[in-house]
Amino acid sequence: MIRSLILSTLLLIFLAGCSIFGSDKQAREPIADGLTPKALYELAEDKFSSGSIEQGIEKLEVILAAYPGSKYAIQARLDIAYNLFKRKKYNRAIIQLNEFIDRYPALPSTPYAYYLRGVIAEEKSSSILDKILTDSAQRDVQSVRDAYSYFALLIDTFPNSKYSEEVPKKLIILKNILAKHEFYIALYYTS
């Protein structure tokens, strides 16, 4: 008798706990508020056009969460990276591009992802003020190394891509910066 009373009480507590969690209205609402991926993408484009980049990125992230297999999700990932780049959020943009390249290694837009990743790393290595005040070879060159490896990987992976055409010139410039950096290190230790 006591045993069945204890079991009944535990069952009642368990069921009451389940009903508490199930009553949350927000948890049952769909992520995309019933919007199609196309409608979300158009909303994001409108946000970008009006200068609300963060809100546009949020709409694209909803596409990634709600419709990960759609064609809009593929483009959304690239658009997120590009707009993060425009906002100077370089690390987040590179993470997005790395995910894109890992997920879609053979799409026609993949060479663009490789190229944009290199451009972002190159841009990350300098700012307007840095170009005026210091020689780029005298600063930390990790971003320059990253840009060089990203561009070299683009040429190795997609040698016939239109994005590979101007990369050899970029590689020469980056290699010269790295060589000057090594030269400054040698000067420092020899003086």
Which residues does each predicted region cover?
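Acidic, polar-rich low-complexity tracts and alpha-helical solenoid repeat scaffolds
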Residues: 18-191
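Sec-dependent bacterial lipoprotein signal peptides
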Residues: 1-18
